[in-house]
């Protein structure tokens, strides 16, 4: 791999701008296809930085990480090399909504990401600030490369922008304001102006981070312990165990004094003082938002999460803030265990530009400028996992475009990645978008535990899955198929089942194992006696067999719904349809269709305000006129 201090070719297939989570996945995915790829970033040393919380996964988010891993992405492998505290959220609930979450040693996570990138063939890393795009001349412009601040021109067939919070980024800490995408790092102004010139729909969003605390100043013994699961469960199917020591967190909480300090200083908050206008994430509110929105709540939990095994920095999860530094210190000192807390770095809010994701095709290519792909917070999302998922798909499609291949997409029935991109490109955002399992209509099928069975074969065909990944998956997939076949064919009579303590109706009908397994943990143990071959199964295969058995009836129903969705999504709509020529459409629907230009009948059906009658009229029109792309 070429680095910034080695000679690099002037021409690439794909250039990725930005070294955050979206950029790393995009660059690696493009390179895995064989595309000659360059990752351009301000500082190579910050590649893979965890800018906010030191954790990966969670409810919905953990599903995305498993899907990224199934497509041979970086995130799952990196967190397995950095995990110091693991929990399976919602473990007491059904497998469909369980969310793996791991806290990371920040330094080890960043090192793991950089190590993977440094050993990825076809990938170069270039230090520099991209200030402009190179485009072709003519009426239908296409991207042809980028221009760096120092004057260098890099040509490429496709470019992926993953600018994160750097696009005209401004940091706020109380009354203090500084132009930056991250503390101490300059924002991207030139690219923002370039996007302005394309007349795209754009807006401002914000996110925030809490103050970091010196671990040595916390009274740990006064606080309840929050233990993780040990042994932790790996995210990546390439890993069987995690070797790092596991540590506990501690739990503090806000008090009545904390809330009064916040109320007394709301006017000094960047958000409530009117110093920024961007909308923040609904599901990750600042402590100011919590106090204002929930005035009857007397306390809010704060999880004290160490940022590393040999790091004195602690991340107080739950008190993101843009209050002045001295107010942050006062509110910390009003909380149990933190009376003497020393702030290493104050919290702050960052406001940045984003592009309305309805300007994108499902491939994440910009409709207005072919060859330019966007991924991550520039599309209005929040979170490492959402960024990484978009980055992988954008990098894959950018590479395919450079190679003269058609784009590939995942639909809502295939993956949470498909749900994410469909929500963005169909509905747009009014606030930072975060993934939840509740956003999917097919969550019984789209589980974190079966991501590889859903996606690795698809990824292999698309060109982003390596030989190593494929070999590992193929062996597991064969074992799983063999177990499912045997479980469907191997039967026992009611009498045989009764002999091992399993009660079923005595109707003489033989029961296959698949109809019995997974419904009752105690019964599953008895099944070992009736079906001795279960003892020899790999633990993961056994677990999957139990889940498939428990969900078998529901899965068949979801499969029918999936086929209906896929049928609508295969009817593609041309960019050149004249919706004014379609009778039976209201003015509101016609205007939305003309503006948003949905790429398929399925996407049109999910537009706000769409009616069955209008959808039928569009379907009839395109079938009659054969207006397919």
Swiss-Prot record:
Belongs to the MnmG family. It comes from the Bacteria. InterPro entries: FAD/NAD-bd_sf, GIDA_C_N, MnmG, MnmG-rel, MnmG-rel_CS, MnmG_C, MnmG_C_subdom, MnmG_C_subdom_sf. Keywords: Cytoplasm, FAD, Flavoprotein, NAD, tRNA processing. GO terms for molecular function: flavin adenine dinucleotide binding. One of its GO terms (cellular component) is cytosol. Its cofactor is FAD. FAD binds at residues 18-23, 130, 188, 377. It is found in: Cytoplasm. Its main location: cytoplasm. Homodimer. Heterotetramer of two MnmE and two MnmG subunits. One of its GO terms (biological process) is tRNA methylation. SUPFAM superfamilies: FAD/NAD(P)-binding domain. NAD-binding protein involved in the addition of a carboxymethylaminomethyl (cmnm) group at the wobble position (U34) of certain tRNAs, forming tRNA-cmnm(5)s(2)U34. Signal peptide: none annotated. NAD(+) binds at residues 280-294. This is tRNA uridine 5-carboxymethylaminomethyl modification enzyme MnmG.
